[in-house]
Amino acid sequence: MHIVQALVSLGIGGSEMVAVEITEHLRANGHRVTVIAANGPLAGRVYDSGAQLLDWPIGKKRLGTLSYIRQLRSWIVENKPDIGHVHSRLPAWVCYLAIRGLALDERPVFITSMHGQYSVSSYSAIMARGDHVIAVSGHIRNYTLKNYLPAYHPDLHTIYGGTSRQAFPYGYQPATTWRKALYQEFPELENKRILLLPGRMSRYKGHATFIELLANLQSEFDDIHGVILGQARPGSRYINELEGLAERHGIADRLTFCGVRTDMRDWMAASALVFNLCSDPPEAFGRIATECLSLGVPLVAWNHGGV
């Protein structure tokens, strides 16, 4: 079969990791896969799997993105994919409009994956218009049924996200060379117990709560150091706000922003505690939680949503 995976970009994130892992699994089982997304750190894994990557920014919120509808329609006619699997809203609209202009026998099966609690709007409703709709957790299934679909919808499937125990083996420890490189890049972490908060730099990910927790612990534990992993532009307003909050709490020297990383397994295994603090809306699926627990690393998380 020929399967298309469509998403915003190949940056580091939950839905992006899911799309790449599906791609790798499909390729390992002999299927043809095409990924349509803007380039990013995960592109190497797509290429390594043997899949094709079309570096089309179909998730960029600008008028020019609509030009990809006709381009994609022509590509579908020429390449005849069997399935189109979309992982985000704007790519879903581009794919849906491209497919809608085709004859029924030329259309691939249109599958959408609900990776989050999208705002209730006609724009977001595209994620519930798939021939098949996938909810990544029971929490997202309930949210989808409440806001988009009737109580009985035969084509809504709950497929829980998971973590490979081969990729995140229990008791795993980073290599000595990794630790040496870590301390060279971040010398303030040497001989410290790392408290780690990974995830996208977004307000609902709980960064302010993490900083407040770190401040409350500093007087009792002098060997802890907070680390925030996540993609953000240097000097962004949100980063500046968090740095200001850390300064007001007197812990600016005990908190490090390490940016986006592809070695998450090593960071988790090197940490004393990992945090998953999504508040409102809650986490759609706790990928960080499953990876962390698979490694056997203690986790602190809110007991709600998809965690």
Tell me the role of every PLM-derived stretch.
Residues 5-67, 150, 154-156, 234, ...:
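N-terminal strand-loop element at the rim of the active site
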Residues 16-24, 193, 197, 202-219, ...:
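A conserved mid-protein helix/loop that constitutes part of the nucleotide-sugar donor-binding site
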Residues 36-41, 198, 225-240:
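Glycosyltransferase donor-sugar binding loop
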Residues 86-92, 114:
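Short His-centered aromatic/hydrophobic patch
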Residues 104-138, 149-151:
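A conserved, positively charged/aromatic
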Residues 131-170:
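A short, active-site helix/loop in glycosyltransferases that binds the activated sugar's phosphate group
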Residues 234-241, 252-261, 267:
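Active-site donor-binding acidic/aromatic loop of nucleotide-activated sugar
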Residues 269-284, 297-298:
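Acidic donor-binding loop of glycosyltransferase active sites
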